[in-house]
Curated annotation (Swiss-Prot):
GO terms for biological process: brassinosteroid mediated signaling pathway; megasporogenesis; meiotic sister chromatid cohesion; microsporogenesis; regulation of phosphorylation. It is found in: Nucleus; Cytoplasm. This is Serine/threonine protein phosphatase 2A 57 kDa regulatory subunit B' alpha isoform. Its main location: nucleus. The gene is B'ALPHA. InterPro entries: ARM-like (IPR011989), ARM-type_fold (IPR016024), PP2A_B56 (IPR002554). Residues 1-61, 462-495 are annotated as: Disordered. The keyword Hydrolase does not apply. PP2A consists of a common heteromeric enzyme, composed of a catalytic subunit (subunits C), a constant regulatory subunit (subunit A), and a variety of regulatory subunits such as subunits B (the R2/B/PR55/B55, R3/B''/PR72/PR130/PR59 and R5/B'/B56 families). Interacts with BZR1. Interacts with BRI1. Interacts with SRK2E/OST1. Expressed ubiquitously, higher levels in leaves. Keywords: Brassinosteroid signaling pathway, Cytoplasm, Nucleus. PANTHER family: SERINE/THREONINE PROTEIN PHOSPHATASE 2A PP2A REGULATORY SUBUNIT B, SERINE_THREONINE PROTEIN PHOSPHATASE 2A 57 KDA REGULATORY SUBUNIT B' ALPHA ISOFORM.
Amino acid sequence: MFKKIMKGANRKASKAEANDSSMYGFDPPGRSGPGSNMIVNHASRGSLVPSSPNSMAAATTQPPPMYSVEPLPLFRDVSVSERQSLFLRKLQICCFQFDFTDTLKNAREKEIKRQTLLELVDFIQSGAGKLTEVCQEEMVKMISVNIFRCLPPASHENTGQEPADLEEEEPYLEPSWPHLQLIYELLLRYIVPSDTDTKVAKRYIDHSFVLRLLELFETEDPREREYLKTILHRIYGKFMVHRPFIRKAMNHIFYRFIYETERHSGIGELLEILGSIINGFALPMKEEHKLFLIRALIPLHKPKPIAMYHQQLSYCIVQFVEKDYKLADTVIRGLLKFWPVTNCTKEVLFLGELEEVLEATQTVEFQRCMVPLFQQIARCLSSSNFQVAERALFLWNNEHVVGLIAQNRGVILPIIFASLEKNIESHWNQAVHGLSANIKRMFMEMDPELFEECQQQYEEKQAKSKQVEEQRQNRWRRLDEAVEEREREDPMITS
Protein backbone atom coordinates (compact mmCIF):
# COMPACT_ATOMS: atom_id res chain seq x y z
CA MET A 1 0.00 0.00 0.00
CA PHE A 2 2.78 2.41 0.95
CA LYS A 3 4.59 1.70 -2.36
CA LYS A 4 1.42 2.57 -4.33
CA ILE A 5 1.06 5.88 -2.51
CA MET A 6 4.71 6.76 -3.18
CA LYS A 7 4.37 5.89 -6.89
CA GLY A 8 1.34 8.16 -7.17
CA ALA A 9 3.17 11.01 -5.47
CA ASN A 10 6.12 10.64 -7.84
CA ARG A 11 3.81 10.79 -10.87
CA LYS A 12 2.22 14.01 -9.57
CA ALA A 13 5.61 15.55 -8.91
CA SER A 14 6.84 14.77 -12.42
CA LYS A 15 3.70 16.38 -13.92
CA ALA A 16 4.21 19.48 -11.81
CA GLU A 17 7.80 19.73 -12.99
CA ALA A 18 6.75 19.38 -16.60
CA ASN A 19 4.30 22.29 -16.22
CA ASP A 20 6.63 24.54 -14.21
CA SER A 21 7.97 27.18 -16.62
CA SER A 22 10.51 28.39 -14.04
CA MET A 23 12.74 25.45 -14.92
CA TYR A 24 13.56 26.91 -18.31
CA GLY A 25 15.54 29.81 -19.65
CA PHE A 26 13.31 30.92 -22.50
CA ASP A 27 9.70 30.96 -23.68
CA PRO A 28 8.41 28.67 -25.12
CA PRO A 29 10.00 26.35 -22.57
CA GLY A 30 12.68 23.84 -23.40
CA ARG A 31 14.92 21.75 -21.21
CA SER A 32 18.52 22.62 -20.74
CA GLY A 33 19.79 19.49 -22.38
CA PRO A 34 21.57 16.36 -21.26
CA GLY A 35 24.51 18.09 -19.56
CA SER A 36 23.86 18.73 -15.87
CA ASN A 37 26.63 21.33 -15.81
CA MET A 38 24.58 23.80 -17.83
CA ILE A 39 22.53 26.31 -15.86
CA VAL A 40 19.37 27.79 -17.34
CA ASN A 41 17.66 30.67 -15.56
CA HIS A 42 14.10 31.77 -16.07
CA ALA A 43 13.53 35.06 -17.88
CA SER A 44 12.87 38.04 -15.67
CA ARG A 45 9.59 38.83 -17.37
CA GLY A 46 6.61 36.88 -18.57
CA SER A 47 5.41 36.74 -22.17
CA LEU A 48 3.39 39.68 -23.35
CA VAL A 49 0.19 39.15 -25.27
CA PRO A 50 0.74 40.13 -28.92
CA SER A 51 -0.92 43.47 -29.55
CA SER A 52 -1.51 43.27 -33.28
CA PRO A 53 -2.41 40.72 -35.98
CA ASN A 54 1.14 41.00 -37.33
CA SER A 55 2.63 40.08 -34.00
CA MET A 56 0.14 37.19 -33.72
CA ALA A 57 1.32 35.90 -37.06
CA ALA A 58 4.94 36.31 -36.05
CA ALA A 59 4.29 34.44 -32.81
CA THR A 60 3.19 31.35 -34.73
CA THR A 61 6.56 31.21 -36.50
CA GLN A 62 8.57 30.84 -33.31
CA PRO A 63 11.03 27.96 -33.57
CA PRO A 64 10.69 24.92 -31.33
CA PRO A 65 12.71 24.94 -28.10
CA MET A 66 16.36 23.86 -28.29
CA TYR A 67 17.76 21.25 -25.93
CA SER A 68 21.48 21.66 -26.64
CA VAL A 69 23.98 24.25 -27.80
CA GLU A 70 24.93 23.64 -31.42
CA PRO A 71 26.24 26.09 -34.03
CA LEU A 72 23.65 27.62 -36.36
CA PRO A 73 24.06 29.03 -39.89
CA LEU A 74 25.33 32.58 -40.33
CA PHE A 75 22.78 35.28 -41.18
CA ARG A 76 24.40 35.86 -44.56
CA ASP A 77 23.98 32.18 -45.43
CA VAL A 78 20.17 32.22 -45.21
CA SER A 79 17.54 34.10 -47.18
CA VAL A 80 16.18 37.41 -45.90
CA SER A 81 12.81 35.81 -45.11
CA GLU A 82 14.47 33.26 -42.80
CA ARG A 83 16.60 35.71 -40.81
CA GLN A 84 13.97 36.59 -38.19
CA SER A 85 13.42 32.91 -37.44
CA LEU A 86 17.19 32.32 -37.29
CA PHE A 87 17.47 35.34 -34.98
CA LEU A 88 15.01 33.71 -32.56
CA ARG A 89 16.91 30.41 -32.66
CA LYS A 90 20.18 32.20 -31.89
CA LEU A 91 18.48 33.93 -28.96
CA GLN A 92 17.53 30.51 -27.60
CA ILE A 93 21.18 29.41 -27.70
CA CYS A 94 22.14 32.53 -25.77
CA CYS A 95 19.66 31.69 -23.00
CA PHE A 96 21.89 28.79 -21.95
CA GLN A 97 24.16 29.76 -19.08
CA PHE A 98 27.37 28.13 -17.93
CA ASP A 99 29.62 27.83 -14.91
CA PHE A 100 32.60 30.13 -15.54
CA THR A 101 34.42 29.22 -12.33
CA ASP A 102 35.81 26.24 -14.27
CA THR A 103 37.26 27.40 -17.59
CA LEU A 104 37.43 23.87 -18.99
CA LYS A 105 33.82 22.95 -18.30
CA ASN A 106 31.57 23.24 -21.41
CA ALA A 107 34.35 25.06 -23.27
CA ARG A 108 32.86 24.22 -26.70
CA GLU A 109 29.35 25.39 -25.75
CA LYS A 110 30.72 28.59 -24.22
CA GLU A 111 32.55 29.43 -27.43
CA ILE A 112 29.44 28.71 -29.54
CA LYS A 113 27.42 31.07 -27.35
CA ARG A 114 30.12 33.75 -27.58
CA GLN A 115 30.23 33.54 -31.38
CA THR A 116 26.43 33.61 -31.50
CA LEU A 117 26.35 36.75 -29.36
CA LEU A 118 28.88 38.40 -31.67
CA GLU A 119 26.65 37.57 -34.65
CA LEU A 120 23.60 39.04 -32.88
CA VAL A 121 25.47 42.26 -32.08
CA ASP A 122 26.64 42.59 -35.70
CA PHE A 123 23.13 41.86 -36.99
CA ILE A 124 21.54 44.56 -34.81
CA GLN A 125 24.30 47.08 -35.56
CA SER A 126 24.12 46.53 -39.32
CA GLY A 127 20.37 47.15 -39.41
CA ALA A 128 20.07 44.30 -41.90
CA GLY A 129 16.42 43.82 -41.04
CA LYS A 130 13.87 45.53 -38.83
CA LEU A 131 13.14 43.35 -35.82
CA THR A 132 9.59 42.18 -35.31
CA GLU A 133 7.93 42.77 -31.95
CA VAL A 134 8.33 39.08 -31.11
CA CYS A 135 12.07 39.28 -31.82
CA GLN A 136 12.38 42.36 -29.63
CA GLU A 137 10.48 40.72 -26.81
CA GLU A 138 12.53 37.52 -26.96
CA MET A 139 15.77 39.47 -27.17
CA VAL A 140 14.96 41.44 -24.01
CA LYS A 141 14.03 38.16 -22.30
CA MET A 142 17.38 36.66 -23.28
CA ILE A 143 19.21 39.73 -22.02
CA SER A 144 17.26 39.55 -18.75
CA VAL A 145 18.12 35.88 -18.27
CA ASN A 146 21.82 36.65 -18.55
CA ILE A 147 22.35 39.95 -16.76
CA PHE A 148 19.82 39.80 -13.92
CA ARG A 149 21.43 37.55 -11.34
CA CYS A 150 22.37 37.40 -7.69
CA LEU A 151 25.56 39.38 -7.21
CA PRO A 152 28.27 37.75 -5.07
CA PRO A 153 28.54 39.10 -1.51
CA ALA A 154 31.31 41.53 -0.64
CA SER A 155 34.34 40.15 1.19
CA HIS A 156 33.26 41.54 4.56
CA GLU A 157 29.84 39.88 4.11
CA ASN A 158 31.54 36.51 3.61
CA THR A 159 33.78 36.79 6.65
CA GLY A 160 31.57 38.82 8.95
CA GLN A 161 34.43 41.28 9.51
CA GLU A 162 34.14 45.06 9.52
CA PRO A 163 34.39 46.43 5.96
CA ALA A 164 37.83 47.72 5.02
CA ASP A 165 38.52 50.92 3.12
CA LEU A 166 36.78 50.58 -0.24
CA GLU A 167 39.74 52.17 -2.03
CA GLU A 168 42.03 49.40 -0.76
CA GLU A 169 39.75 46.50 -1.68
CA GLU A 170 40.41 44.53 -4.86
CA PRO A 171 37.19 44.56 -6.94
CA TYR A 172 35.55 41.26 -7.80
CA LEU A 173 35.73 40.68 -11.56
CA GLU A 174 32.81 38.79 -13.08
CA PRO A 175 34.10 35.46 -14.52
CA SER A 176 31.37 35.38 -17.19
CA TRP A 177 32.42 38.78 -18.57
CA PRO A 178 33.30 37.40 -22.06
CA HIS A 179 29.56 36.71 -22.48
CA LEU A 180 28.17 39.54 -20.34
CA GLN A 181 30.07 42.20 -22.27
CA LEU A 182 28.54 41.09 -25.56
CA ILE A 183 25.05 41.01 -24.03
CA TYR A 184 25.46 44.57 -22.79
CA GLU A 185 26.71 45.54 -26.27
CA LEU A 186 23.58 43.96 -27.75
CA LEU A 187 21.33 45.90 -25.37
CA LEU A 188 23.18 49.12 -26.15
CA ARG A 189 22.88 48.56 -29.93
CA TYR A 190 19.15 47.95 -29.47
CA ILE A 191 18.54 51.15 -27.46
CA VAL A 192 20.82 53.66 -29.21
CA PRO A 193 19.64 53.70 -32.88
CA SER A 194 17.28 56.53 -33.83
CA ASP A 195 15.03 54.13 -35.74
CA THR A 196 14.21 52.11 -32.59
CA ASP A 197 10.48 52.63 -31.98
CA THR A 198 10.22 53.66 -28.33
CA LYS A 199 6.47 53.00 -28.31
CA VAL A 200 7.21 49.33 -28.96
CA ALA A 201 10.46 49.10 -27.02
CA LYS A 202 8.97 50.55 -23.82
CA ARG A 203 6.76 47.45 -23.53
CA TYR A 204 9.92 45.42 -22.90
CA ILE A 205 12.26 48.08 -21.46
CA ASP A 206 9.72 48.77 -18.73
CA HIS A 207 9.90 49.95 -15.10
CA SER A 208 10.68 46.46 -13.87
CA PHE A 209 13.59 46.15 -16.30
CA VAL A 210 14.96 49.59 -15.38
CA LEU A 211 14.69 48.89 -11.65
CA ARG A 212 16.66 45.66 -12.02
CA LEU A 213 19.28 47.50 -14.08
CA LEU A 214 19.68 49.94 -11.20
CA GLU A 215 20.13 47.07 -8.76
CA LEU A 216 23.07 45.83 -10.86
CA PHE A 217 25.02 49.03 -10.09
CA GLU A 218 26.03 47.30 -6.85
CA THR A 219 28.34 45.00 -8.82
CA GLU A 220 32.00 45.33 -7.86
CA ASP A 221 33.15 44.85 -11.46
CA PRO A 222 34.00 48.35 -12.81
CA ARG A 223 33.65 47.14 -16.42
CA GLU A 224 30.03 46.17 -15.86
CA ARG A 225 29.23 49.42 -14.04
CA GLU A 226 30.63 51.38 -16.99
CA TYR A 227 28.25 49.60 -19.39
CA LEU A 228 25.33 50.03 -16.98
CA LYS A 229 26.07 53.75 -16.73
CA THR A 230 26.03 54.18 -20.52
CA ILE A 231 22.89 52.07 -20.99
CA LEU A 232 20.88 53.75 -18.22
CA HIS A 233 21.89 57.17 -19.51
CA ARG A 234 20.68 56.20 -23.01
CA ILE A 235 17.40 54.85 -21.60
CA TYR A 236 16.87 58.11 -19.70
CA GLY A 237 17.48 60.11 -22.86
CA LYS A 238 15.36 57.97 -25.18
CA PHE A 239 12.42 56.90 -23.00
CA MET A 240 10.95 60.11 -21.61
CA VAL A 241 8.19 58.13 -19.90
CA HIS A 242 10.81 56.54 -17.60
CA ARG A 243 12.55 59.75 -16.49
CA PRO A 244 10.59 60.50 -13.27
CA PHE A 245 10.76 56.83 -12.30
CA ILE A 246 14.55 56.67 -12.80
CA ARG A 247 15.11 59.81 -10.71
CA LYS A 248 12.89 58.47 -7.93
CA ALA A 249 14.62 55.08 -7.95
CA MET A 250 18.02 56.80 -7.74
CA ASN A 251 16.73 58.78 -4.77
CA HIS A 252 15.90 55.57 -2.94
CA ILE A 253 19.36 54.13 -3.64
CA PHE A 254 20.99 57.26 -2.24
CA TYR A 255 18.75 57.30 0.86
CA ARG A 256 19.57 53.69 1.64
CA PHE A 257 23.28 54.32 1.14
CA ILE A 258 23.31 57.45 3.34
CA TYR A 259 21.13 56.28 6.22
CA GLU A 260 21.54 52.49 6.25
CA THR A 261 24.46 50.77 4.55
CA GLU A 262 27.16 53.32 3.57
CA ARG A 263 28.22 50.66 1.08
CA HIS A 264 27.45 50.75 -2.64
CA SER A 265 29.89 50.27 -5.49
CA GLY A 266 28.00 52.32 -8.07
CA ILE A 267 27.32 55.66 -6.38
CA GLY A 268 29.96 57.37 -8.54
CA GLU A 269 28.45 56.06 -11.78
CA LEU A 270 24.91 57.04 -10.72
CA LEU A 271 26.12 60.55 -9.87
CA GLU A 272 27.84 60.76 -13.24
CA ILE A 273 24.49 60.08 -14.93
CA LEU A 274 22.85 62.64 -12.67
CA GLY A 275 25.42 65.27 -13.62
CA SER A 276 24.26 64.99 -17.22
CA ILE A 277 20.59 64.99 -16.16
CA ILE A 278 21.03 68.13 -14.02
CA ASN A 279 22.76 69.84 -16.92
CA GLY A 280 19.56 69.39 -18.93
CA PHE A 281 17.17 70.77 -16.30
CA ALA A 282 14.97 73.55 -17.64
CA LEU A 283 14.72 76.93 -15.90
CA PRO A 284 13.09 77.97 -13.66
CA MET A 285 14.07 74.84 -11.78
CA LYS A 286 11.24 72.68 -10.44
CA GLU A 287 10.75 72.41 -6.70
CA GLU A 288 11.15 68.62 -7.05
CA HIS A 289 14.73 69.09 -8.26
CA LYS A 290 15.60 71.50 -5.44
CA LEU A 291 14.28 69.00 -2.89
CA PHE A 292 16.46 66.34 -4.49
CA LEU A 293 19.49 68.59 -3.94
CA ILE A 294 18.61 69.20 -0.28
CA ARG A 295 17.48 65.69 0.66
CA ALA A 296 19.84 63.49 -1.35
CA LEU A 297 22.86 65.24 -2.85
CA ILE A 298 23.92 67.40 0.10
CA PRO A 299 23.54 64.53 2.65
CA LEU A 300 25.81 62.42 0.40
CA HIS A 301 28.65 64.40 2.01
CA LYS A 302 28.03 62.49 5.24
CA PRO A 303 29.18 58.88 4.50
CA LYS A 304 32.78 57.90 5.23
CA PRO A 305 33.62 56.55 1.74
CA ILE A 306 32.92 59.93 0.10
CA ALA A 307 36.35 59.87 -1.57
CA MET A 308 35.04 57.12 -3.90
CA TYR A 309 32.48 59.43 -5.50
CA HIS A 310 33.31 62.98 -4.40
CA GLN A 311 34.43 64.17 -7.83
CA GLN A 312 31.06 63.25 -9.38
CA LEU A 313 29.14 64.60 -6.38
CA SER A 314 30.98 67.92 -6.52
CA TYR A 315 30.18 68.22 -10.22
CA CYS A 316 26.44 67.69 -9.53
CA ILE A 317 26.45 70.25 -6.71
CA VAL A 318 28.21 72.88 -8.83
CA GLN A 319 25.79 72.21 -11.71
CA PHE A 320 22.88 73.12 -9.43
CA VAL A 321 24.53 76.40 -8.37
CA GLU A 322 25.42 77.29 -11.96
CA LYS A 323 21.83 76.58 -13.02
CA ASP A 324 20.35 78.65 -10.19
CA TYR A 325 22.79 80.92 -8.34
CA LYS A 326 20.23 81.46 -5.55
CA LEU A 327 20.95 77.91 -4.36
CA ALA A 328 24.52 78.85 -3.35
CA ASP A 329 23.52 79.80 0.21
CA THR A 330 21.65 76.48 0.65
CA VAL A 331 24.61 74.48 -0.69
CA ILE A 332 27.25 76.27 1.41
CA ARG A 333 25.22 75.89 4.62
CA GLY A 334 24.71 72.22 3.73
CA LEU A 335 28.47 71.75 3.37
CA LEU A 336 29.04 73.43 6.74
CA LYS A 337 26.45 71.14 8.33
CA PHE A 338 28.32 68.01 7.23
CA TRP A 339 31.83 69.46 7.59
CA PRO A 340 34.22 66.75 8.90
CA VAL A 341 35.69 67.28 12.36
CA THR A 342 38.41 64.63 12.60
CA ASN A 343 38.92 63.47 8.99
CA CYS A 344 41.59 65.70 7.41
CA THR A 345 41.48 63.99 4.00
CA LYS A 346 37.74 64.58 3.79
CA GLU A 347 38.24 68.18 4.90
CA VAL A 348 40.60 68.82 1.98
CA LEU A 349 37.91 67.48 -0.39
CA PHE A 350 35.32 69.81 1.14
CA LEU A 351 37.61 72.82 0.70
CA GLY A 352 38.14 71.97 -2.97
CA GLU A 353 34.39 71.65 -3.54
CA LEU A 354 33.75 74.86 -1.61
CA GLU A 355 36.05 76.78 -3.96
CA GLU A 356 34.11 75.50 -7.00
CA VAL A 357 30.80 76.51 -5.40
CA LEU A 358 32.13 79.96 -4.46
CA GLU A 359 33.25 80.46 -8.05
CA ALA A 360 29.58 80.25 -9.11
CA THR A 361 28.30 82.32 -6.16
CA GLN A 362 27.02 85.89 -6.49
CA THR A 363 27.56 88.66 -3.92
CA VAL A 364 24.07 88.62 -2.35
CA GLU A 365 24.11 84.86 -1.69
CA PHE A 366 27.68 85.08 -0.44
CA GLN A 367 26.76 87.74 2.11
CA ARG A 368 24.02 85.54 3.55
CA CYS A 369 26.43 82.82 4.64
CA MET A 370 29.85 84.50 4.85
CA VAL A 371 30.02 84.70 8.67
CA PRO A 372 29.60 80.95 9.42
CA LEU A 373 31.57 80.15 6.27
CA PHE A 374 34.67 82.12 7.28
CA GLN A 375 34.42 80.97 10.88
CA GLN A 376 34.94 77.47 9.45
CA ILE A 377 37.67 78.64 7.08
CA ALA A 378 39.45 80.29 10.03
CA ARG A 379 39.47 76.93 11.83
CA CYS A 380 40.93 75.33 8.70
CA LEU A 381 43.59 78.05 8.41
CA SER A 382 44.85 77.30 11.92
CA SER A 383 44.71 73.51 11.49
CA SER A 384 47.83 71.66 12.60
CA ASN A 385 47.40 69.45 9.51
CA PHE A 386 49.38 71.33 6.87
CA GLN A 387 47.30 69.95 3.96
CA VAL A 388 44.09 71.38 5.41
CA ALA A 389 45.69 74.75 6.23
CA GLU A 390 47.39 74.94 2.83
CA ARG A 391 44.18 74.08 0.93
CA ALA A 392 42.28 76.78 2.84
CA LEU A 393 45.00 79.32 2.03
CA PHE A 394 44.80 78.37 -1.67
CA LEU A 395 41.30 79.90 -1.76
CA TRP A 396 43.07 83.27 -2.10
CA ASN A 397 44.52 82.12 -5.45
CA ASN A 398 41.02 82.28 -6.97
CA GLU A 399 40.26 85.72 -8.41
CA HIS A 400 36.48 85.43 -8.02
CA VAL A 401 36.79 84.35 -4.38
CA VAL A 402 39.26 87.18 -3.68
CA GLY A 403 36.77 89.60 -5.26
CA LEU A 404 33.99 88.41 -2.93
CA ILE A 405 36.33 88.68 0.07
CA ALA A 406 37.48 92.17 -0.95
CA GLN A 407 33.89 93.43 -1.17
CA ASN A 408 33.18 92.11 2.33
CA ARG A 409 36.59 92.50 3.94
CA GLY A 410 35.17 94.49 6.86
CA VAL A 411 33.36 91.35 8.05
CA ILE A 412 35.83 88.69 6.92
CA LEU A 413 39.23 90.03 8.03
CA PRO A 414 38.34 90.29 11.75
CA ILE A 415 37.19 86.64 11.64
CA ILE A 416 40.38 85.22 10.10
CA PHE A 417 43.00 87.68 11.35
CA ALA A 418 43.91 85.70 14.47
CA SER A 419 44.40 82.49 12.45
CA LEU A 420 46.74 84.25 10.02
CA GLU A 421 48.79 85.79 12.85
CA LYS A 422 49.12 82.47 14.69
CA ASN A 423 50.28 80.76 11.50
CA ILE A 424 52.96 83.40 11.00
CA GLU A 425 54.06 83.23 14.63
CA SER A 426 54.06 79.51 15.31
CA HIS A 427 52.91 77.15 12.51
CA TRP A 428 55.40 74.32 12.03
CA ASN A 429 55.03 74.16 8.23
CA GLN A 430 57.04 76.71 6.23
CA ALA A 431 54.65 76.68 3.24
CA VAL A 432 51.70 77.54 5.50
CA HIS A 433 53.84 80.21 7.18
CA GLY A 434 54.71 81.81 3.83
CA LEU A 435 51.18 81.70 2.37
CA SER A 436 49.74 83.24 5.54
CA ALA A 437 52.26 86.10 5.31
CA ASN A 438 51.28 86.71 1.66
CA ILE A 439 47.57 86.91 2.51
CA LYS A 440 48.29 89.22 5.43
CA ARG A 441 50.22 91.49 3.07
CA MET A 442 47.32 91.39 0.58
CA PHE A 443 44.87 92.66 3.21
CA MET A 444 47.37 95.29 4.33
CA GLU A 445 47.54 96.69 0.78
CA MET A 446 43.80 96.29 0.24
CA ASP A 447 42.68 98.30 3.29
CA PRO A 448 45.47 99.67 5.55
CA GLU A 449 43.05 101.25 8.04
CA LEU A 450 41.03 98.06 8.52
CA PHE A 451 44.22 96.04 8.81
CA GLU A 452 45.60 98.41 11.46
CA GLU A 453 42.33 98.18 13.38
CA CYS A 454 42.38 94.36 13.28
CA GLN A 455 46.05 94.36 14.32
CA GLN A 456 45.26 96.58 17.30
CA GLN A 457 42.27 94.44 18.33
CA TYR A 458 44.38 91.30 18.05
CA GLU A 459 47.17 92.80 20.19
CA GLU A 460 44.66 93.99 22.80
CA LYS A 461 43.05 90.57 22.87
CA GLN A 462 46.45 88.89 23.22
CA ALA A 463 47.42 91.28 26.04
CA LYS A 464 44.14 90.60 27.79
CA SER A 465 44.62 86.85 27.37
CA LYS A 466 48.12 87.17 28.79
CA GLN A 467 46.78 89.14 31.74
CA VAL A 468 44.07 86.53 32.39
CA GLU A 469 46.71 83.79 32.24
CA GLU A 470 48.93 85.66 34.72
CA GLN A 471 45.98 86.09 37.09
CA ARG A 472 45.24 82.39 36.84
CA GLN A 473 48.85 81.51 37.60
CA ASN A 474 48.85 83.92 40.56
CA ARG A 475 45.74 82.29 41.98
CA TRP A 476 47.35 78.87 41.76
CA ARG A 477 50.54 80.19 43.35
CA ARG A 478 48.62 81.75 46.25
CA LEU A 479 46.71 78.50 46.70
CA ASP A 480 49.98 76.54 46.86
CA GLU A 481 51.38 78.99 49.40
CA ALA A 482 48.24 78.73 51.54
CA VAL A 483 48.48 74.93 51.53
CA GLU A 484 52.16 75.04 52.55
CA GLU A 485 51.41 77.52 55.37
CA ARG A 486 48.56 75.34 56.61
CA GLU A 487 50.84 72.30 56.63
CA ARG A 488 53.41 74.15 58.73
CA GLU A 489 50.77 75.26 61.23
CA ASP A 490 49.16 71.82 61.53
CA PRO A 491 51.60 68.98 60.74
CA MET A 492 48.84 66.43 61.46
CA ILE A 493 47.21 67.29 58.13
CA THR A 494 50.00 65.57 56.16
CA SER A 495 50.75 62.81 58.65
